[in-house]
């Protein structure tokens, strides 16, 4: 089986208040807003995509790496075939229009892998 190409790479920051966080990044760093919603926002900084996700309180304040792919199932198959593991199985998040899973690479680094759904 061939490798699954990555369509977008992003760093995700968990935030408690989406509007406040977006205001901070746009006003402090003059970022270019690509997506702005209560469930997921993205801005572009020097070619890198930074994503903000609600839930940034308590133990959900981590920063994480994420990959957007066209075929989540194929990507997860390649993850396991190449020594990684699935730490959270695929699930649909209809409000965000994504199907998402979490994986660990061969070194234990956690990565979110998502596929856009309609």
How should these model regions be labeled?
Residues 1-4, 8-16, 44, 57-82, 84-118, ...:
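Vicinal oxygen chelate
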Residues 31-63, 110-116:
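Conserved short beta-strand elements that form part of the metal-binding/catalytic scaffold
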Residues 1-22, 47-49, 63-67, 114-118:
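N-terminal beta-strand motif that seeds the catalytic metal site of vicinal oxygen chelate
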Residues 30-35, 85-89:
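Short secondary-structure junctions
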Residues 20-21, 38-41, 96, 118:
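Short glycine/proline-centered loop/turn elements that form peptide/ligand docking sites
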Residues 27-30, 81:
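Short, intrinsically disordered, mixed-charge
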Residues 19-28, 101, 110:
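Conserved active-site alpha-helix within GNAT-family acetyltransferase domains
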């Amino acid at each position: 089986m061939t490798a699954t190409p990555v369509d977008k790479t992003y760093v995700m920051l968990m935030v408690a208040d989406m509007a406040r966080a977006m205001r901070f990044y746009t006003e402090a760093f003059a970022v270019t807003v690509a997506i702005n919603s209560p469930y997921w926002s993205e801005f572009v900084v020097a070619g890198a995509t930074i994503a903000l996700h609600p839930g940034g309180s308590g133990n959900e304040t981590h920063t994480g790496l994420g990959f957007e792919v066209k075929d989540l199932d194929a990507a997860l198959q390649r993850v396991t075939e190449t020594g990684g593991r699935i730490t959270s199985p695929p699930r649909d998040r209809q409000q965000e229009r994504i199907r998402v899973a979490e994986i660990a690479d061969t070194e234990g680094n956690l990565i979110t892998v998502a596929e856009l759904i309609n």
